[in-house]
């Protein structure tokens, strides 16, 4: 059976799941982190969420559609967010948060948590 829910309801539930998992990782004392992607398919919508550089794509007869965008520190909006929080992005082999991490969103990564958020971006 199905419930009466909207893409916004699904997005909120997925976001809560990401943030709860992030908090659980941190509570365990985990220093490492993980990127995450989630795709929920309903009869009327495809709802894709991600944090980090895990990517969801949709293959159709006409080609491939990217459902998510990678969270890289060099992405203009991500770099602005990090800098607004007092952090920096350093270009080494690739753009890195505080010269270390090559993604700007992830679950865990306790040492950079101030700048590396678990809050997913969602498209529906």
Language-model segment annotations:
Residues 1-124:
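PP2C/PPM-type serine/threonine phosphatase catalytic domain
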